[in-house]
Every structure is written in C-alpha cells, then in structure tokens.
A protein has these predicted regions:
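Conserved CoA-thioester-binding segment of acyl-CoA-metabolizing enzymes
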Residues: 1-55, 91
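C-terminal long alpha-helix characteristic of the crotonase
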Residues: 22, 123-128, 179-227, 233, ...
Length: 257
C-alpha cells in the first residue's frame, strides 16, 4: 500500500506493521503517515486481529524522525497542518481499542520517538537510541512529544531531553521509564510477539477498558476515577467477566473469545 512504505504481516491474531523506508532510516513523510493511518483503520476493523506490533525496516532505525527535506518550502500554516496530521494519527494509536506495542529496533528520534510513545508500551533492542532533537533544527516536537514524554519520564527529564536535543541509549531509556524492556536485536520481535500473545489471550473487553481508563490518568484525578468506574462497569457486565470468574472458581484457564 502506498508504494510499500508500510508492510504488514498477520501472525495468528497479531498484525506486524513495519515502517519501510530503510534508505531514509524509515523517516516519516505524508505518504508514510497516510499509509499508517489506512493500516490502523484496517487493523481496528478486523475482528480476527487482537493486537499489533509496530517496528521499522532494517537494523538501523525504528523511525529516525520526520523527513525534513520539504521544511524550507513551508510556512506557519504548513507547519501547523503538518503537526496536526501527525498528532491526530498518533492519538488514534494511543486511544486504539486494541493493544499496540512498539518494537524499537534502532534510532527512534523526533517523530520516531513520538510514534513509539503513542504505542501502549515499548520494547527496545540494545542498539536503540531515543531523542527529541528538534531544537537542533530550531523547532520543537510537534507530534505530541512535549506531552507524552513529560508524562512518561517526568517534567525535568523531558525538559532536559528536549532542550539539549541529546539522544539516550536503550538502557537509559529503560532506567527512566521510557521503555519497558531491552533485549538483543535478534530477540526483539520474538519478545514483542511473546508479550502480545500473553496480552491477546486476555479479555478483549477488559483490554479496551484498561486502555480507556489508563489514558484517563492524564485527566485530573477526579475525572480519571470516574472514567475508571465507567470502564469497570462495562467490563463487569461482559460475557468475558462471566467466563473469567467461572474459570477462576472452577480452577481452570479462562477461554476468552
């Protein structure tokens, strides 16, 4: 689709989504964003798919940033539109009703770091590098980086990363909570698939409500608690709850559909 800038592979109930511009270190441009948006819509509509993994083509980069080759031709309105397009897509990933993991296989810089942060959690290879180097271009993160990075690692660390434009390695990203796991490059997809297999064996209803309720933690505490209560009610009234509780009482593994 769209010149094969996005590759997809279905593995059982999991969709592997690969950003495929290795010659450009998988940099994001309008074509990639459009193709990723189309892929996300297909994924969410397909009831046979329970989760997705996003990664980059090759061993050098997850996504090394946005393709800045056209920036000098733009103006303020173009910049705002460019940011809004990415923000809308990445918010759709963050709020997707199915779990999405980022398997970060190299450079995740600028828009690439922002894409990884929009996923529900991140697994990184040992050679991964993270950063928001936009300040070196005289701009700021525009795809939600100022917001998500702050929420993930705290205001002080986020300010430092964005103000210095410096990159951090996978171990530092793990230490500050930007990623959940670090592994060898050759083990990255295996680990991501193993985690996703565990996740997708759980209740679909509960997974969706966990995403909604956890994202509501970004609201004020009172509103977040209200959202959690509503989400708990939806899961409590589901067939999955009946199966889960029955299986527990019968001392067997739950069989969620």
């Amino acid at each position: 689709m769209n010149d094969n800038v996005i590759l997809t592979e279905k593995k059982d109930a999991v969709l592997l989504i690969t950003i495929n511009r290795p010659e450009k270190l998988n940099a994001l441009n309008a074509n990639v964003l459009d193709a990723l948006k189309d892929t996300l819509e297909i994924f969410l509509k397909d009831d046979t798919l329970k989760g997705a993994i996003i990664t980059g083509s090759g061993e050098k980069a997850f996504v090394a940033g946005a393709d800045i080759s056209g920036f000098l031709k733009g103006d303020r309105n173009m910049g705002a539109d460019f940011a809004a397009k990415g923000q809308t897509l990445f918010s759709s990933i963050e709020n997707a009703s199915k779990p999405i993991i980022a398997a970060v296989n190299g450079f995740a810089l600028g828009g690439g770091c922002e894409l990884a942060m929009s996923c529900h959690f991140r697994i990184a290879s040992e050679n991964a590098k993270f950063g928001q180097p936009e300040i070196n271009l005289g701009i700021i993160p525009g795809y939600g980086g100022t917001q998500r990075l702050t929420r993930l690692v705290g205001k002080g660390r986020a300010m430092e990363l964005m103000m210095t434009g410096e990159n951090i390695d996978a171990q530092e990203a793990l230490r500050i909570g930007l990623v959940n796991h670090v592994c060898k490059q050759e083990d990255l997809l295996t680990l991501a698939e193993t985690k996703m297999k565990t996740i997708t064996s759980k209740s679909r209803v509960a997974l969706t409500q966990i995403i909604i309720a956890t994202n509501a933690a970004d609201e004020n505490p009172e509103e977040g608690m209200k959202t959690e209560a509503l989400c708990f009610g939806k899961s409590f009234a589901s067939d999955d709850m009946v199966e889960g509780v029955t299986a527990f009482l019968e001392k067997r593994k739950a069989n969620f559909k």
